[in-house]
Design a protein with these regions (language model features):
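Cyclophilin-like peptidyl-prolyl cis-trans isomerases
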Residues: 2, 21, 25-255
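Bacterial N-terminal signal peptides that target proteins for export
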Residues: 2-13
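Bacterial N-terminal signal peptides
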Residues: 12-22
Length: 255
């Protein structure tokens, strides 16, 4: 009974972190284009389309047709990320494109949750380019393109056995599925996109899992993993910055 109570308490703590970290960590207002407030929604989300090629909203988003590797330098040490465009082409393409544009250079990890147990490190808010912007106030920003519009990418989840990902719809606990059979899972070291309660609200903010986080599978888009430097990730603290980010392999796969 004591063991079961501990398990229940652990799960409750993780769910609380999910509500206060990832969902509020991406956008509080989603800029002026949306007034949606963040929070865990129990209502099922409706997919815009399971075939992204038919959706004009995402026609011009970059795609990664294959694999790539990205090197982050944090606290003077490298973190090598594998970026999976095979199973998450749009999410991966967005990240690689932003790396090549220099968006992540100098940005802070504004949320780091290690207690009461390891959870995630989260960064990628472009507002952090301003050295006077308080780190504690980060978490609402996304990438603004040359036209002044915020780039949003669809929720992209590929299930085992499917030839294409499903878009714009959570397939995990947010849709009532406890253990979805997804290709890219929230294992320790997984690289994924933060978003608000709206499924297609991810932009530039990402997180790295500090532990296996199965309860996030199917609801947040994993698009890569840490290949080398997980010890560096484990030692990231709030306010630490990405000194540089560059594509070291597979840049030719960005379309």
């Amino acid at each position: 009974m004591v063991t079961n109570n501990k398990v229940l308490l652990t799960n409750l703590i993780l769910v609380m972190f999910l509500g206060s970290l990832l969902l509020t960590g991406c956008n509080n207002a989603l800029t002026n284009e949306s007034s949606s407030s963040d929070g865990v929604s129990n209502a099922p989300t409706q997919p815009v389309s399971t075939n992204i090629s038919s959706n004009e909203m995402f026609d011009n988003l970059p795609r990664l047709e294959g694999m790539a590797k990205v090197e982050l330098i944090v606290n003077g040490s490298p973190i090598i990320l594998e970026i999976n465009g095979k199973d998450a082409p749009i999410t991966a393409g967005n990240f690689v494109d932003l790396v090549q544009k220099g968006v992540y250079d100098g940005l802070a990890f504004h949320r780091v949750v290690k207690e009461p147990q390891p959870f995630v490190v989260q960064g990628g808010d472009p507002q952090g380019k301003d050295p006077n912007f308080p780190v504690a106030g980060l978490g609402t920003g996304g990438y603004i393109d040359e036209s002044g519009r915020r780039r949003s990418v669809p929720l992209e989840i590929k299930q085992v056995g499917d030839s294409e990902p499903t878009y714009s719809k959570g397939l995990g606990q947010q849709s009532g599925v406890r253990s979805p059979n997804v290709v890219l899972k929230h294992d320790r070291g997984a690289l994924a996109m933060a978003r608000s309660a709206q499924p297609d609200s991810a932009s530039s903010q990402f997180y790295i899992a500090l532990a296996d986080l199965e309860f996030l599978d199917g609801d947040y888009a994993v698009f890569g993993k840490v290949l080398e430097g997980m010890n560096v990730v484990d030692n990231i603290n709030q306010g630490d910055r990405i000194e540089s980010a560059k594509v070291i392999e597979g840049a030719e796969n960005l379309k």
